[in-house]
């Protein structure tokens, strides 16, 4: 490159290079884990970050059942959903969610940290959460990253 270019190069769908990464959630605080995962999903850790393009990596979170919540958050925090019927509000605690579907707890925390737009809906599709240490994505050759390396 002999001349300087003063144009900002934005990524697009064709030029984005996505990787697969694995994050082990064992003994990690839910909020800290979710914020780092959201950062990688969005692509903000890459130098070519473009806000309107899905330029993040595909993230696999394993051992979601071993995530921790500090203090009394296991029992005091309440997740609310609505069935659509009168009087249909349903309340659940993280302890109940962790007992039934541990992956849902991590997925819900990460989704809350992504944009509330169509792009955010696309990005959450790049998140794969599994309760145990096994995952079916070995063919993608994911690289393992530690939480403090992001």
Residue ranges of model-derived segments:
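Ribosome large-subunit tunnel/peptidyl-transferase-proximal elements
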Residues: 1-108, 118, 136-150
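Hydrophobic, well-ordered secondary-structure segments
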Residues: 106-107, 111, 124
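C-terminal structural segments of small proteins and small subunits
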Residues: 120-130, 136
